[in-house]
Amino acid sequence: MRLTILLLLVVQQIARPASAADTAAVAPWKINTPIVTYWAGPALTDAVARQMAEGGWNLVWCGEKQLDVAQRHGLRAQLQDGLLRPETLDNPAQREKLDALIARVRNHPALYSYFITDEPGAAEFPALGKLVAYLRQRDPAHLAYINLFPTYASNQQLGTKGDKVTAYQDHLRQYVEIVKPSLVSYDHYQFAKGGDNPDYFLNLAMIRRAAQGARVPFLNIVQACTWTPSMRVPGPDELRYLVYTTLAYGGQGISYYVYCHPGHTGGIALPDGRPTPLYHALKSLNRQFVAIARELQPLRSLAVYHAGMSPPGSVQLPREAPFRFDPPVAPLAYRPSERVRGFVLGYFGKDEKPTHMVAVNLDYKAEAAVWLIGPGNLEAFDAKAGTWSATGGVRLELRLPPGGGKLVRVAK
């Protein structure tokens, strides 16, 4: 009987909801390793998890029963469960089940985040804010993940009024003020058969500003497939462009739509599990993303400048900028739907002083060579090796592959 009572007490302790005392000493969620994930993938088996880990993905989607699978392969897990929705809080019985779920999973080594919803309108923000606060109170160590609409969503979808920029700005403002997220995530798919959506950089810039205002990181969900005759499957060079432009704008997470899902062509894996050409390309790019984003994580994104074409949302590189091209890159006329050509320079540093810079060749169809001048002796980062090397002066020739980039810094 004494043993039975002891076991009962242990079970009750494990299953009981977290109290304020339980979570007072728990550190709040931090992004830690930059995120590489996906949207819409297969059920998480050992074979799938092994493929994802080998490909450089580090955050997988799963249910409670698959958390152990993620752990076996050194992966972080985003939990999906029907209880993780605002309506649960309005039903005492469902809320009790949610509390029990949190109590069961919050100490699992693989748990990283809770998936809440995709593309909510502004009218849903108050209820989502309550759920995010509820989860944060009971499990502050794990992220409550919500993904937002892109700029091309309608005003009806966004739940705001005005022109495209005004409506989207208001949508983002309400989101960060009401929901108070720990990370801002959005999706934007621009590769159409008739050309490229012109607002990719506008969306990046607006998300960057919103995340900076909230002092949280952001994640970019990018296109890796087609799901309709009007869109095209991007190639490896276009994926490189998405990876490096996300880095230049200060992104700390990237996600690919889709990994593998019915009704979609391309993606990362085929329905039978075999990897696509994009998987093999991303195997290296994913690791480059993490390596560069980790170097930039202690810093602040200070500015983003374009040289060459000026797509919507871009700011042209000032002539006397701390990091600049020599000779300067000539301005190019931009016409919507054509691919953007030129360069992006993302400045990073502390105390408003740029010490690091990510340069990106925006032409995903051609290599580029350009001379860069910095505010001091420069060092270049090898994203594949994870090492820095001196360049011998303040000038550096950058030879960038299609859509590729380079991280440089002022020597310490």
Language-model features: locations:
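Sec/Tat signal peptide C-region and signal peptidase I cleavage site
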Residues: R16-S19
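Glycan-processing catalytic domains of CAZymes
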Residues: A21-G376, A380-K412
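Bacterial N-terminal signal peptides
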Residues: R2-Q13
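Universal eukaryotic N-terminal targeting presequences
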Residues: M1-R2, A53
